[in-house]
Amino acid sequence: MPSIEAVGAREILDSRGNPTVEVEVVLEDGTLGRAAVPSGASTGAFEAVELRDGDNRYGGKGVTKAVAAVIDRIGPAIMELEATEQRLLDATLIDLDGTPGKSALGANALLGVSLAVAKAAAASSGLPLFRYLGGPTAHLLPVPMMNILNGGAHADTNVDIQEFMIAPIGASTFAESLRWGAEVYHALKSVLKARGLATGVGDEGGFAPSLPTNREALDLIAEGIDKAGFALGTDIALALDVASTEFYADGSYTFEGNSRSAEYLSDYYAELVSAYPIVSIEDPLAEDDWDGWVALTERLGGKVQLVGDDLFVTNPERLARGIALKAANALLVKVNQIGTLTETLDAVNLAHRSGYRAMMSHRSGETEDTTIADLAVAVDCGQIKTGAPARSERVAKYNQLLRIEEELDDAARYAGAAAFPRRRQAG
């Protein structure tokens, strides 16, 4: 396999108009791998560290330091490594940084290199990225968890829950699931218009109206599903990302204007799961509320998927702690939370070995990079969260999954309802 011959980087813009890092790696046979790094709005305290400039450019959010780290520090250190030696490459990156949170060179610098090398190696091998990473058996297309109504940190409104998602579990193919999701999205827009509600969109393409309660959002989506001609619960299920760390402080949660306990929220989620066909709840409790997580998982873990995002931050060590405590039952996978491809794959493998599900995810600050679409298929996630069927940085991932399904042809399998074995059956 060709070795690494050149490493370059540049500062580009993400979907929120903030700078991010793009890395290009060229191998000795001339093949190129390019990767752009995403960035989150609601970030966990335990995530790997993005290196930002902190000067006057771009309000302090420039990434010229991270770009320089790629060119001046990382490039020379990995020159002539074989591109297929991903684990060795990533270990080299981690050692070169030398800090627990990757704060010296920046997780944004390390991840850009890690992904660009993998993409170059795939190109050199003549394989699509999903096949290069997942091997000959990778064929499972994920259920798109479409965030069609935004609140929390993704929208400037009074809705606490950050994401209200639809999951087209009854579709027979990924292409059909994408069509169903798009049709519900447009139906929801007409429902909102008829109510005189705002139809502007948030960071991830979902609508962002101001609503009196969080349950009102679920009712509006249910109406949109019905208007589009689909059956709630059998054709299309619901999912939430509460992002509760965002409204947690000093041991309590400020929810719908009141100070609430973990026990109150647990009762609230139990009511929602009973009233609506909700298959997944992400970050229902805060990232350091371990006792609350354990109690909630014991109570609801047999009925609904409970996803740790801020809780686990795609970190195998934090995930191992959660598994030992029986906190949550699923892992959200965000490559930039941990900073290398190898560590991401290790986290997913640990989840699967331990009976936890895994959901591949974008960030609110995205680019046209489609790596996570391939990665979702490569690691058999069965679920992907990459926004509404709107805004091209979101749709880019969905379109890549369409291409993958087409390439797999008869071998393609759509995860569908099987992705959520804990779901409450409709009826």
UniProtKB/Swiss-Prot annotation:
Kindly indicate whether the keyword Magnesium belongs to this entry: yes
Single annotated GO MF? magnesium ion binding
Q: Which residues form a coiled coil?
A: none
Q: Which UniProt keywords apply?
A: Cytoplasm, Glycolysis, Lyase, Magnesium, Metal-binding, Secreted
Catalytic reactions on record: (2R)-2-phosphoglycerate = phosphoenolpyruvate + H2O
Instruction: Give the SMART domains listed for this entry.
Output: Enolase_C (SM01192), Enolase_N (SM01193)
Protein name from the UniProt record: Enolase
Task: Supply the source organism for this entry.
Answer: Frankia casuarinae (strain DSM 45818 / CECT 9043 / HFP020203 / CcI3)
List the taxonomic lineage: Bacteria, Bacillati, Actinomycetota, Actinomycetes, Frankiales
